[in-house]
């Protein structure tokens, strides 16, 4: 089913209702649109009892949501047009959860939104979050230790991490799938199916490594659909009102939860999913997927296998079919396994209670699904499809070797005074969680670290300034116990290097430089250089390292040099082309011919990456991660001398004050007003939306007499905010 605007009226009946309702719970009709405040207001709207439940995994609900996003886009060329239409639809009782999804897509991919730097608000703007502070709670929850919790509950601190869930929430705004025609709402994504497999496989690798740090077993994949969940799950107290839990030994219902209404395509029988599962496995083993043209199957190759396998799991048929030259994949045969599978888990927690706002379990929610332990069993199962394809289509890891010799790889703390600096080990810590951001048990972090490696060219024609040598360094880590499993390697960074002479260089990368990490601090704290939404779905900085062990847990670091360069990702649309020419997660994305063709039985990943003579473009080293505990997270953010009176007040011009008083009713010369709205001010100035330029001047061509804030000004304001907004002494 492909939705058009003509179909919208009938689809809206699924997720909205238009009876008499309390007007105070929605936007009042208005002719004036205040873009930033209206966007924040829409994302903060709670679901009311008279809203029809929204299931983000149901094809009908998804088509409605995508049609709403199209309506916002069709309302006019300016953001004001789309936001005005959103407010109109909310008056007609569109479910706010549906509108958040639709508006998030619209803002992420709208040219006007990108030019004006208006992005979807962070997760903390969701109505479930009652506070706006970025700072951890003063009264912390219990620190997580192995003798207080057992099994998957031990990892609740990791699953409930705010930054993990915020990252996942943004990922789904950028990458949309589930049967809709992406070319009609956000455009086609290059290698979208491969992205789907890679991202979720990396999530599983990180989660399993975290489990190993606590001596827990690896995740058991949900390969058998009549399996059961030994442990029950209940969302944290602030979510239990909104999403259901399930008791121990729960399993999928064979038909549907008997408490659920018999609504078409909200859930389907287990046997249908088993049929899709087996058909996809069979297609990978056979090396081809069936199409509607019996004599034109889609033949898998080394280059396309992961993209098509991932795309079919995620039901990205409209986009995939465009690659087939006139025929279509057999959707009846392969189905929509990913989303209906999550729906079967959500169905286990269904609550048939009058006025229930969201009767399903957390797996229907993009912002909260990783909190549920069943999420990880499901994605471990989906990883197996990638494993099967990766084994069937191996690769020669020398094919893209850079003509260099790598040596002296080191991963270590940045602090030279640390007792672990000379040993080349790293320290993590468990500190108090931000309970007001729905974290539980602890907050994982790490001391600042760096990695460096020596690079020397061995190219036949030596590099020079006139003829430089460009290459990419790719860094991974794995728990030493898991290093012989391709899919347990965690990607840490990719960096392009240019050599201009024969002498060896040492490439140094800080943890915050990582190309796979989010470019922001904890709790969505914006970085002025990376305010665009496209940078917000990387891996959280605080979770880049596994927690390790108190006595130190051994890890292996690996670096490979490939003969390519990776351009910086575009900060604004069009960003639909994946910028790395190699496979995602290369070289661990597929099996190695160096292993599959080995006849001695002695080859392994361990022996290959330690063989510098045969593979000089590869190097590795070992290090340990030591786990510590911090019972207090109070930090002093530099510079500490910034106060309201000596710095911040002077940042606001008379024109800024007049604009804010007119548009939003608060006074930028008033300390209390600025302190109350400091988060929004930092976000707007860091992303260059403010100070607002008038007349012939624009945000890209600002008035020299009324310039945008510099990076230093943003950093000072950030430090002032995080240090508690010190007032200082009035010089008057």
UniProtKB/Swiss-Prot annotation:
Catalyzed chemical reaction(s): (-)-cyclopenine = viridicatin + methyl isocyanate + H(+); (-)-4'-methoxycyclopenine = 4'-methoxyviridicatin + methyl isocyanate + H(+)
Binding-site residues for Zn(2+), renumbered to this chain: 168, 172, 200
Coiled coil location: none
Molecular function (Gene Ontology), one example: lyase activity
Family under the similarity heading: Belongs to the tyrosinase family.
UniProt EC number: 4.1.99.27
Record's function text: Cyclopenase; part of the gene cluster that mediates the biosynthesis of the aspoquinolone mycotoxins. Within the pathway, the cyclopenase asqI catalyzes the conversion of 4'-methoxycyclopenin into 4'-methoxyviridicatin. Cyclopenin can also be converted into viridicatin by asqI. The first step of the pathway is catalyzed by the nonribosomal peptide synthetase asqK that condenses anthranilic acid and O-methyl-L-tyrosine to produce 4'-methoxycyclopeptin. 4'-methoxycyclopeptin is then converted to 4'-methoxydehydrocyclopeptin by the ketoglutarate-dependent dioxygenase asqJ.
Cofactor note: Binds 1 zinc ion per subunit.
InterPro entries attached to this UniProt entry: Di-copper_centre_dom_sf, Hemocyanin/hexamerin, Hemocyanin/hexamerin_mid_dom, Hemocyanin_C, Hemocyanin_C_sf, Ig_E-set
Cofactor(s) in the UniProt record: Zn(2+)
Domain of life: Eukaryota
Lyase recorded as keyword: yes
UniProt pathway annotation: Secondary metabolite biosynthesis; Alkaloid biosynthesis; Mycotoxin biosynthesis
Metal-binding listed as a keyword: yes
One Pfam family this sequence matches: Hemocyanin_M
PANTHER family: LARVAL STORAGE PROTEIN/PHENOLOXIDASE, PHENOLOXIDASE 2-RELATED
Name assigned to this protein: Cyclopenase asqI
Keywords: Lyase, Metal-binding, Zinc
């Amino acid at each position: 089913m492909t939705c058009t605007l003509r179909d919208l009226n009938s689809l809206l009946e699924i997720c909205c209702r238009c009876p008499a309702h309390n007007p105070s719970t929605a936007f009042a009709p208005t002719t004036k649109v205040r873009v930033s405040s209206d966007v924040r207001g829409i994302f903060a709207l709670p679901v009311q009892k008279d809203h029809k439940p929204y299931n983000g995994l149901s094809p009908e609900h998804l088509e409605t949501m995508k049609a709403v996003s199209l309506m916002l886009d069709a309302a006019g060329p300016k953001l004001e047009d789309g936001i005005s239409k959103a407010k109109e639809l909310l008056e007609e009782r569109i479910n706010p959860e549906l509108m958040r999804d639709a508006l998030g897509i619209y803002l992420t991919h709208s040219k006007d939104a990108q030019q004006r730097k208006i992005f979807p608000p962070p997760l903390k703007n969701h109505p479930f979050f009652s506070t706006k502070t970025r700072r951890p709670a003063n009264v912390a929850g219990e620190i997580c230790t192995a003798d207080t919790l057992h099994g998957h509950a031990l990892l609740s601190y990791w699953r409930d991490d705010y930054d993990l869930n915020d990252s996942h929430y943004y990922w789904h705004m950028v990458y949309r799938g589930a049967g809709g025609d992406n070319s009609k709402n956000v455009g086609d994504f290059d290698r979208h199916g491969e992205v789907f497999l890679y991202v979720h496989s990396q999530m599983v690798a990180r989660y399993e490594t975290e489990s190993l740090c606590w001596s827990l077993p690896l995740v058991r994949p949900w390969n058998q659909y009549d399996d059961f969940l030994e442990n029950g799950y209940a969302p944290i107290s602030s979510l239990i009102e909104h999403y259901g839990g399930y008791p121990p030994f729960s399993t999928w219902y064979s038909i549907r939860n008997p408490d659920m209404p018999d609504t078409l395509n909200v859930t389907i029988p287990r046997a249908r999913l088993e049929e899709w599962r087996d058909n996809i496995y069979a297609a990978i083993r056979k090396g081809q997927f069936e199409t509607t043209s019996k004599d034109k199957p889609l033949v898998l190759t080394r280059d396309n296998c992961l993209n098509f396998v991932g795309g079919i799991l995620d039901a990205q048929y409209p986009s995939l079919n465009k690659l087939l030259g006139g025929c279509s994949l057999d959707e009846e045969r392969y189905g929509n396994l990913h989303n209906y599978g999550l729906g079967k888990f959500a169905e286990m927690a269904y609550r048939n209670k009058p006025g229930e706002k969201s009767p399903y379990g957390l797996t229907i929610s993009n912002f909260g699904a990783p909190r549920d332990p069943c999420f990880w069993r499901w994605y471990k199962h989906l990883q197996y499809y990638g494993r099967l394809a990766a084994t069937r289509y191996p690769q020669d890891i020398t094919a893209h070797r850079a003509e260099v010799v790598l040596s002296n790889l080191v991963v270590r703390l940045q602090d030279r005074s640390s007792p672990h600096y000379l040993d080349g080990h790293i320290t993590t810590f468990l500190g108090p969680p931000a309970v007001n951001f729905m974290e539980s048990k602890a907050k994982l972090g790490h001391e600042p670290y760096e990695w460096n490696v020596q690079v020397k060219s061995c190219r036949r024609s030596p590099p020079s300034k006139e003829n430089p040598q460009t290459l990419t360094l790719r860094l991974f880590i794995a728990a030493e116990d898991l290093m012989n499993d391709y899919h347990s390697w965690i990607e840490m960074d990719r960096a392009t290097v240019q050599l201009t002479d024969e002498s060896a260089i040492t490439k140094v990368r800080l943890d915050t430089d990582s190309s796979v990490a989010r470019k922001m601090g904890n709790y969505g704290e914006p970085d002025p250089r990376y305010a665009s939404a496209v940078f917000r779905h990387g891996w959280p900085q605080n979770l880049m390292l596994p927690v390790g062990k108190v006595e130190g847990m051994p890890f292996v670091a690996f670096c490979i040099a490939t003969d390519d360069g990776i351009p910086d990702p575009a900060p604004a649309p069009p960003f639909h082309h994946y910028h790395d020419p190699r496979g995602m997660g290369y070289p661990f994305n597929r099996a190695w011919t160096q292993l599959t063709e080995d006849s001695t039985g002695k080859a392994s990943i361990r022996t290959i990456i330690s063989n510098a003579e045969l593979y000089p473009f590869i190097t590795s080293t070992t290090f340990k991660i030591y786990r510590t505990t911090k019972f207090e997270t109070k930090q002093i953010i530099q510079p500490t001398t910034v106060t309201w009176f000596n710095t911040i007040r002077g940042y606001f011009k008379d024109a800024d004050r007049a604009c804010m008083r007119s548009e939003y009713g608060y006074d930028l010369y008033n300390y209390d007003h600025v302190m109350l709205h400091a988060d929004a001010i930092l976000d707007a100035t860091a992303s260059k939306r403010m100070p607002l330029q008038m007349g012939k001047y624009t945000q890209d061509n600002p008035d020299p007499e009324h310039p945008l804030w510099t990076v230093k000004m943003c950093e000072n304001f950030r430090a002032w905010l995080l240090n508690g907004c010190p007032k200082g002494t009035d010089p008057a």
